[in-house]
């Protein structure tokens, strides 16, 4: 039997340095990753260090609203 709400949510992680600097002419876009998090274990916003292909380095990617 299924319990009301699922524990796992699909979340989108977005590069914080691309967003902070804005999308300039050198950067063609903003890096985004799609992943899952467990709502019971991680109730706060998720932040992970991932590789940004527009900044060419590892940066902090934070969870955004859909």
Curated annotation (Swiss-Prot):
Signal peptide: none annotated. One of its GO terms (molecular function) is structural constituent of ribosome. InterPro entries: Ribosomal_bL33 (IPR001705), Ribosomal_bL33_CS (IPR018264), Ribosomal_bL33_sf (IPR038584), Ribosomal_zn-bd (IPR011332). It is found in: Plastid, Chloroplast. Its main location: plastid. GO terms for cellular component: chloroplast; ribonucleoprotein complex; ribosome. This is Large ribosomal subunit protein bL33c. It comes from Acorus calamus (Sweet flag). The lineage of its organism: Eukaryota, Viridiplantae, Streptophyta, Embryophyta, Tracheophyta.
């Amino acid at each position: 039997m299924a319990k009301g709400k699922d524990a796992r949510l699909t979340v989108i992680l977005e590069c914080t340095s691309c967003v902070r600097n804005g999308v300039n002419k050198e950067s063609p876009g903003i890096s985004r990753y799609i992943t899952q998090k467990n709502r019971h274990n991680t109730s706060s916003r998720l932040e992970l260090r991932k590789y940004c292909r527009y900044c060419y380095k590892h940066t902090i990617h934070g969870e955004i609203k859909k």
